[in-house]
From Swiss-Prot:
Contains a C-terminal catalytic domain, and an N-terminal region which modulates catalytic activity. It catalyses: [protein]-L-glutamate 5-O-methyl ester + H2O = L-glutamyl-[protein] + methanol + H(+); L-glutaminyl-[protein] + H2O = L-glutamyl-[protein] + NH4(+). The keyword Phosphoprotein applies. This is Protein-glutamate methylesterase/protein-glutamine glutaminase. Its main location: cytoplasm. Its EC number is 3.1.1.61, 3.5.1.44. Pfam families: CheB_methylest (PF01339), Response_reg (PF00072). The gene is cheB.
Length: 381
């Protein structure tokens, strides 16, 4: 897209107030403009043909046609970057996760009270998400190729990264059985950070993990409420236990702990055990939870026992913390540009010098397991 051309945005929402607020926020930005608004998907279909927008904002729940039904048809017939506008309810969060699964790039949570003030408070975030969506790589919803062999050499893996153009979709039933791999230590940890596009990337990564894998701590940029539904969704799909982190609980093998929305997640120590720590200290890199907070705590408390993974996302959160992890002895992997929805956080982590290996998403899980095995962190039987 020509950088001098403004990002063309079409807003679809049954609330006249939301349409008005979004129009004000978007048109106030120097690099984007609203080319149309629609109260429902039926009217939006004609406007899409007329205006050919770069990005859509789409309400989840609307009359005449549900936002998810419309999104599914859109991604099949006319793939377009979409930012969902979602309510802060359990139903809204579950619908949003489904939208991200269908191909939406990101979402904005509607405030429960004070709609205009609440939306305007996040004007910069809304604009950033639209910018990220405009340059995002949409995920084709097609059958995936078989994952590359887990034991691929680093040189081969980096070479392969340049040849991958789409992130494979994995079915839980298709993940290889874990019976041949047993982890011999509970002291090793996998530390993961992600943002835009991360919900699906995290799902694909966790689907590769066997029930006896090291404990996994995860920060995905999400508001409060959404992480609860996210953890429940993953727990129903994966062979490991996935849960929202609780302050002070012991980190166990075969478990993944997701940072709650609006809470920083850190790795702590209690005697010989690793524990989760939560706090509401100020946002870092404009985020709470922040990936840098988790990564830095892993550098302090786990050192070489940690293996870091940074996945798709906009911005630079995690880059400084990943370098600290590397300097403390951790081995770190970044998702490659071709398989990222937005190549921001991995790019910054690479630029900072904190990354050992750059891999396409479908190779990261197998590579992590192979790395743990090769360094005595797992035993194969």
């Amino acid at each position: 897209m020509n950088e001098k051309r403004k990002i063309q945005v079409l807003c679809i929402d049954d609330s006249a107030l939301i349409r008005s607020i979004l129009k004000e926020i978007i048109n106030a930005q120097p690099d984007m403009e609203v080319v149309g608004v629609a109260p429902d998907p039926i009217i939006a279909r004609d406007l899409i043909k007329q205006t050919n927008p770069d990005v859509l904002t789409l309400d989840v729940e609307m009359p005449k046609m549900d936002g998810l039904d419309f999104l599914e048809k859109l991604m099949r017939l006319r793939p377009t970057p979409v930012v969902m506008i979602s309510s802060l309810t359990e139903r809204g969060s579950e619908a949003t996760l489904r939208a991200l699964e269908l191909g939406a790039v990101d979402f904005v949570a509607k405030p429960k009270l004070g709609m205009r003030d609440g939306m305007n408070e996040y004007a910069d975030q809304i604009a950033d998400k639209i910018r990220a969506a405009a340059r995002a790589r949409l995920r084709p919803r097609t059958a995936s190729p078989a994952p590359a062999p887990a034991a691929a050499s680093p040189a081969h893996a980096v070479h392969t990264a340049h040849a991958v153009h789409a992130r494979p979709e994995h079915d839980a039933a298709a993940v290889p059985a874990p019976a041949r791999t047993h982890f011999s230590s509970t002291e090793k940890l996998i530390i993961v950070g992600a943002s835009t596009g991360g919900t699906e990337a995290i799902k694909d990564f966790l689907l590769e993990m066997p029930p006896d894998c090291p404990g996994i701590l995860i920060v995905q940029h999400m508001p409060a409420g959404f992480t609860t539904s996210f953890a429940k969704r993953l727990d129903g799909l994966c062979r490991i236990r996935v849960k929202e982190a609780v302050h002070g609980e012991r980190v166990l093998p075969g478990h993944a702990y997701i940072a709650p929305g609006d809470m920083h997640l850190s790795l702590g120590r209690s005697g010989a055990n690793y524990v989760t720590e939560l706090d509401q200290n100020p946002p870092v890199n404009r985020h709470r939870p922040a990936v840098d907070v988790l990564f830095r705590s892993a550098a302090r408390n786990a050192g070489a026992n940690a293996l870091g993974v940074i996945l798709t996302g906009m911005g630079k959160d995690g880059a400084a913390g990943m370098l600290e992890m590397r300097n403390a002895g951790a081995y770190n992997v970044a998702q490659d540009e071709a398989s990222c929805v937005v190549y921001g956080m991995p790019k910054e982590a690479v630029a900072h010098g904190g990354v050992h290996e750059i891999l396409p998403l479908h190779q990261i899980g197998p590579h992590v397991l192979a790395r743990l095995s090769a360094h005595g962190r797992v035993t194969r039987v």
